[in-house]
């Protein structure tokens, strides 16, 4: 069966501002008439994401609103109950979307109240069927929703009652990044993300056993005139910068090495830790890694960096070895680079580029704590 939408722009207009020429028709090939509406819905979603790429912050999330349009984004990976959350909690709140919360720079939201894709069981097996918000008796979509809070959902059958708490900002960033679409295409993407996450004092974590028990917690965040922004964590933005690479390469950090940062796309620092976005990969740096990265803004000797660590974090009987080890991890991860070393012969960069990397996915010694693909969902 060929399912064609000859006026995709009109279908998207309710959720995406009509600020450009009409999109070309969407055509979806499907051999199953039951699955065809889901396939069409998915195609429209992908086109909507493409239209806002590089402009809007897009969460893979449920959007539910209060009476004045104050909207909470409930973020979680696919297959973990977001549609169930929308169908249950949306009966008492406004339904904005169950797929993609599209957040503009002023935190207004382009509503996308698509039909809900609900998994059903029949003789064929698991299928996804489209159910309208009206059929599910969800609340009306507000005309001008705006983001007021971002909540990471985490189902835990051992939790006796729902627990809504503030997340450390760095934890929230790393939890939400995999559930964004085309984040690196935004200008200063991590700063844009942090501004959204910190609304109402967030980001928030909601741990629960059954989503129907969470209505009060979610509704409280949408209540009119709620202002928790004063509780938001303080964070520092370090905009990306292009750094020159020396013609020669040193791979091993020694006490005579001179180091500085490599090119990075964006970075934020909070509570002594940081997230550095480089080559579309976010790396979380602990206090030690962050202090070294911040200190290496300009070319610095290992001795200078060591002294900075002692001054900011404190002394340690093995501080020199710990700093050398941490610097090596940061160099291996290409977060820092050695630009000179008078006591080590360099390797030509083209020869170094041919050597296999041994760093991907490394977790080490209080320096680089985690790395993951920042654009795992949509490029």
What are these model-derived regions, one by one?
Residues 1-78, 91-92, 102-290, 294, ...:
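A noncatalytic interaction/capping subdomain that flanks phosphate/NTP-handling catalytic cores
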Residues 82:
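Conserved lysine of the Walker
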Residues 93-97:
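GT-A fold catalytic core of metal-dependent nucleotide-sugar glycosyltransferases
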Residues 295-300:
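Short helix-to-turn junction characteristic of helix-turn-helix DNA-binding domains
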Residues 366, 373-375:
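Acidic/polar hotspots within intrinsically disordered regions
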């Amino acid at each position: 069966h060929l399912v064609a939408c000859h006026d995709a722009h009109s279908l998207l207009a309710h959720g995406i501002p009509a600020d450009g020429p009409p999109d070309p028709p969407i055509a979806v090939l499907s051999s199953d008439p039951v699955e065809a509406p889901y396939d069409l819905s998915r195609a429209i979603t992908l086109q909507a994401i493409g239209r806002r790429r590089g402009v809007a912050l897009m969460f893979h999330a449920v959007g539910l609103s209060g009476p004045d349009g104050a909207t909470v984004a409930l973020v979680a990976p696919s297959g973990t109950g977001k549609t169930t959350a929308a169908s249950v909690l949306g009966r008492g709140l406004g339904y904005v979307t169950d797929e993609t919360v599209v957040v503009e720079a002023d935190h207004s939201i382009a509503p996308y109240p698509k039909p809900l894709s609900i998994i059903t069981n029949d003789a064929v097996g698991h299928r996804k069927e489209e159910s309208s918000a009206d059929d599910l008796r969800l609340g009306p979509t507000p005309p001008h929703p705006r983001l007021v809070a971002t909540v990471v959902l985490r189902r835990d059958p051992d939790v006796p009652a729902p627990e809504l708490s503030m997340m450390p900002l760095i934890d929230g960033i790393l939890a939400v990044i995999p559930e964004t679409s085309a984040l690196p295409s935004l200008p200063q993407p991590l700063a844009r993300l942090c501004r959204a996450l910190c609304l109402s004092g967030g980001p928030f974590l909601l741990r629960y056993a059954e989503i129907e028990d969470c209505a009060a917690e979610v509704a409280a965040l949408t209540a009119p005139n709620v202002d928790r922004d004063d509780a938001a964590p303080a964070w520092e933005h370090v905009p990306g910068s292009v750094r020159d690479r020396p013609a020669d390469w040193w791979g091993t950090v020694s006490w005579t090495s001179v180091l500085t940062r490599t090119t990075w796309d964006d970075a934020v620092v909070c509570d002594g830790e940081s997230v550095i976005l480089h080559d579309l990969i976010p790396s979380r740096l602990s206090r030690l890694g962050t202090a070294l990265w911040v200190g290496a803004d300009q070319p610095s000797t290992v001795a200078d960096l060591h002294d900075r660590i002692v001054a900011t974090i404190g002394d340690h009987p093995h501080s020199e070895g710990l700093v050398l080890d941490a610097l090596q991890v940061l160099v291996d991860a290409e977060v820092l680079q050695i630009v000179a070393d008078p006591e080590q012969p360099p390797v030509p960069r083209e020869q170094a580029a041919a050597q296999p990397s041994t760093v991907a996915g490394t977790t080490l010694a209080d320096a680089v704590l985690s790395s993951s693909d920042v654009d795992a969902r949509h490029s």
